């Protein structure tokens, strides 16, 4: 069964890839569907991986820290879980006047499947909320 440690490691690798400038094609390797979209539940937006690449390209010094995550087993074959939890996220606008740093607690709701290769893949990726800290730079998604 997929474990919380595996989910955290998988999520950390995805976040590190995005923060390092991963292309949409490189990000797609983390998804079961190479044309996946990221769903932003709190405002109704959906973001293609191409748009996700462009969005993150404007920031520097991105950092993600996992908060608490719960797993709900969904299926044994293929092996799937629903992973819900929080991630503290910060990223800096290099050319913007202060405040430059986005600081937010982000709600994550993911369906993850173990592929035949053994690798984990996002089946569904939803951001359920972005709680911006009082000293955060504004962000319009």
Question: At which residue positions do the language-model features occur?
Answer:
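Short N-terminal signal/transit or membrane-insertion segments
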Residues: 11-17, 44-54, 137-141
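Residue-level detector of alpha-helix boundaries and kinks
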Residues: 12-13, 37, 41, 97
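A beta-strand edge to alpha-helix "cap/lid" segment located at domain peripheries
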Residues: 54-141
């Amino acid at each position: 069964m997929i474990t919380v440690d595996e989910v955290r490691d998988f999520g950390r690798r995805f976040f590190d890839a995005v923060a390092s400038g991963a292309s949409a094609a490189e990000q797609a390797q983390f998804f079961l569907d190479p044309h996946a979209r990221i769903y932003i539940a709190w405002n109704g937006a959906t973001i293609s991986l191409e748009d996700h690449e462009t969005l993150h390209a404007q920031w520097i010094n991105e950092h993600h820290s996992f908060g608490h995550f719960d797993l709900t087993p969904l299926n044994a074959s293929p092996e799937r879980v629903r992973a819900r939890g929080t991630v503290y996220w910060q990223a800096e606008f290099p050319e913007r006047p202060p405040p430059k740093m986005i600081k937010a607690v982000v709600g994550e709701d993911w369906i993850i499947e173990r592929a035949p290769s053994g690798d984990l893949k996002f089946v569904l990726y939803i951001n359920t909320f972005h709680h911006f800290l009082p000293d955060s730079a504004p962000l319009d998604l």
